[in-house]
């Protein structure tokens, strides 16, 4: 059953490529490169990840290719996560239009936090210290908590219909995402506390270990459709 679910991700390749094509040809996209470029990167990398998914912890893949490697995926994801969170914060500042100074200032915390989360994720991979995944994911809770709170703060402003719709979408997304992320953080905590291998891991900045894990992130992978290798159901 899980095998079909993973293979079904390929549908996402088609939908994302269609969205990319529509964005570039049909939709009346903005000329603002700070909006357009992050959006194109996000859609393109989303299509790539649907075709070459990988689980960072188990290094499980569905296509045995270097393109499925943890390193390649994480490198692309680092770029896309920083750029699209910048885009989110940029949109908040556009909507705010200098009305609330605290919105402009706090929106930059989203960008700072996503950069911090990247360090935790790369630390988990290159130092083989999987506890860092918790702090990476906690960072995402912080990011979208800020996004939601700032959106609520701006809902009473005199906004255009388009901007008001974006604010509502932000709030609804936050209302759905934040409780789910709390459950996700609890599942990560449970995995850390019940997995003897993770509990045995030590924080070690040894350069030889970093080199070894770097090579492992490129070369090591296993084709698996076992739900346990993908974080379970």
Locate predicted features.
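First transmembrane helix
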Residues: 2-29
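C-terminal transmembrane-bundle signature of multipass membrane proteins
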Residues: 11-21, 148-233
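Internal transmembrane alpha-helix with an interfacial aromatic "cap," most often the third helix
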Residues: 21-27, 48-57, 76-107, 115-125, ...
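Membrane-interfacial loop-to-transmembrane alpha-helix junctions, especially the N-terminal start
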Residues: 29-41, 98-111, 161-169
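Lipid-exposed faces of alpha-helical membrane segments in multi-pass integral membrane proteins
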Residues: 37-48, 79-82, 109-116, 142, ...
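Helix-loop junctions on the outward
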Residues: 44-72
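Short aromatic-rich membrane-water interface segments that cap or initiate transmembrane helices
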Residues: 66-79, 228
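Eukaryote-biased recognition of C-terminal alpha-helical segments
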Residues: 128-140
